[in-house]
């Protein structure tokens, strides 16, 4: 079974109040469809980084986000993952202010996860830096996971 790393935007979109923006609302719906549809049969994993981020903000919403993640296997932050995350920041592929995003990418790469599921197209699933990021990760001895949104993972019969 393929593995999928759940990054913070997934529980955030799933549990968010109804959005007024059409784009945000469609992302919420796609996330809910994918999640409620059994996550398309993936073996889900997450990290303490995701749990920490999901626990921030409004206490009631944080409780919902953390509840959604309950029972999902948590990947350990290894020295290899920390080194790779620092390398992604040092190479300018992820800005220092977004270092937690580099941790998500590094954890999924080091732990050989197949997919990193995210709505973060600025620092994680950014097509403008994807190939440079892949090269940096490969040069570090790891394989970059496929970075995609829940919408991209919906089965044909689930597609919205």
Where does each model-flagged region fall?
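Short, well-structured N-terminal submotif of metal-dependent ribonuclease cores
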Residues: 1-46, 55-66, 72, 90-95, ...
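Short secondary-structure boundary segments
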Residues: 8, 48, 119-121
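A structural micro-motif
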Residues: 42, 72, 114, 143-145
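Residues at the C-termini of beta-strands that transition into short coil/loop
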Residues: 48, 78, 148-151
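Active-site neighborhoods of divalent-metal-dependent phosphate/nucleic-acid chemistry enzymes
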Residues: 71-132, 154, 159
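C-terminal end-helix/capping segment
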Residues: 125-146
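C-terminal interaction segment
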Residues: 140-160
């Amino acid at each position: 079974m393929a593995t999928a790393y759940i990054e913070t935007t997934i529980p955030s979109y799933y549990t968010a109040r109804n959005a007024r923006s059409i784009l945000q609302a469609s992302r919420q719906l796609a996330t809910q469809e994918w999640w409620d549809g059994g996550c398309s049969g993936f073996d889900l994993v997450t990290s303490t980084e995701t749990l920490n981020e999901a626990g921030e903000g409004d206490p009631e919403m944080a409780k919902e986000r953390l509840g959604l993640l309950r029972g999902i296997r948590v990947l350990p932050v290894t020295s290899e993952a920390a080194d790779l995350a620092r390398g992604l920041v040092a190479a300018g592929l992820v800005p220092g202010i977004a270092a937690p995003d580099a941790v998500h990418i590094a954890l999924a790469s080091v732990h050989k996860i197949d997919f990193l599921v995210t709505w973060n197209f600025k620092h994680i699933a950014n097509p403008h830096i994807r190939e440079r990021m892949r090269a940096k990760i490969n040069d570090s001895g790891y394989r970059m996971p496929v970075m995609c949104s829940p919408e991209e993972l919906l089965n044909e019969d689930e597609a919205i």
